[in-house]
From Swiss-Prot:
It comes from Escherichia coli (strain K12). Disruption phenotype: No curli production. Residues 149-214 form the HTH luxR-type domain. Keywords: Cell inner membrane, Cell membrane, DNA-binding, Membrane, Transcription, Transcription regulation. Pfam families: GerE, VpsT-like_REC. Residues 173-192 bind DNA. It is a peripheral membrane protein. CDD domains: LuxR_C_like. This is CsgBAC operon transcriptional regulatory protein. It is found in: Cell inner membrane. It comes from the Bacteria. Its main location: membrane.
Amino acid sequence: MFNEVHSIHGHTLLLITKSSLQATALLQHLKQSLAITGKLHNIQRSLDDISSGSIILLDMMEADKKLIHYWQDTLSRKNNNIKILLLNTPEDYPYRDIENWPHINGVFYSMEDQERVVNGLQGVLRGECYFTQKLASYLITHSGNYRYNSTESALLTHREKEILNKLRIGASNNEIARSLFISENTVKTHLYNLFKKIAVKNRTQAVSWANDNLRR
């Protein structure tokens, strides 16, 4: 059972993989780099309890189809205040399969080094997601199938409100990026985050929500 421990961020890192010296070293590196508490859990063993606020890093290199189905089912029944990130994900892992993961907040591919993982997790601790541009675009487009429970009362960041207001005047992603001096990939990531927060499926619904809830 996962003992409840918390970091200064209010989060706990749970690395789910096969026990090994390499896995232990990775966990220690992440704990030190992120100033976060953490625990290693054997991917082949069941997990009865996960503390609220947990950030779960699941090693896809050690997961066969049976284990993937087990963890998807187990994690889908857990507290909504958890975040799941896939580690060592095969480059050809289908987007539709990524979409099946509950509470998914990031995907690290097998070619990414530890520092990329650290940087991605730092973003997740700030409330961001970690996806490639193509994956973020796919998830935004298919957000109606994305199994993430959200509420309209979720607080939006200042940047998310700026982007929503740009949507209200019909701005494209490229136009939003140029006007806010950020990359188009960053715009798509912000869109994906705010779509989750306000529980909408597309830009039209986001604009409708903004018209009802935001001042210009």
